[in-house]
Amino acid sequence: MKVIFLADVKGKGKKGEIKEVPTGYAQNFLIKKNLAKEATSQSIGELKGKQKAEEKAQAEILAEAQAVKAVLDEDKTRVQFQEKVGPDGRTFGSITAKKISEELQKQFGVKVDKRHIVLDHPIRAIGLIEVPVKLHKEVTAEIKLTITEA
């Protein structure tokens, strides 16, 4: 019997796959537990439509990420910070991913989620710093920061 998997089933198939499985297994286990449904021509058509919509949505997200990368790669896109600095040359406050995200939004109107900004630890030094940003699984950019003494 041909079934369309509605969820990942270990050893049998992944969500969205169409596979041939034994009839008893399909009727008594997969279909009863809503892990799969019978692959009729109508359900196959629905699946193809959903997959096309998903691909289109992913393409839009990728295009948006590439547009943000283009803005971040420009030389004039340099996020400015003014921080108080102690005698040892380190800032009193630290610059976190949240602060970077907020300043990027305020100064350039570019929205980047703070969770996408890759910071090992908050920045406490002054000068020019480049911070990597993972905009999409295929798109990575750099945010240029200029941290000056206030």
UniProtKB/Swiss-Prot annotation:
HAMAP family: Ribosomal_bL9. Keywords: Ribonucleoprotein, Ribosomal protein, RNA-binding, rRNA-binding. PROSITE patterns: RIBOSOMAL_L9 (PS00651). InterPro entries: Ribosomal_bL9 (IPR000244), Ribosomal_bL9/RNase_H1_N (IPR009027), Ribosomal_bL9_bac/chp (IPR020594), Ribosomal_bL9_C (IPR020069), Ribosomal_bL9_C_sf (IPR036791), Ribosomal_bL9_N (IPR020070), Ribosomal_bL9_N_sf (IPR036935). The lineage of its organism: Bacteria, Bacillati, Bacillota, Bacilli, Lactobacillales. Binds to the 23S rRNA. GO terms for cellular component: ribonucleoprotein complex; ribosome. This is Large ribosomal subunit protein bL9. NCBIfam families: L9. GO terms for biological process: translation. It holds the Pfam family Ribosomal_L9_C. PANTHER family: 50S RIBOSOMAL PROTEIN L9. One of its GO terms (molecular function) is rRNA binding. Belongs to the bacterial ribosomal protein bL9 family.
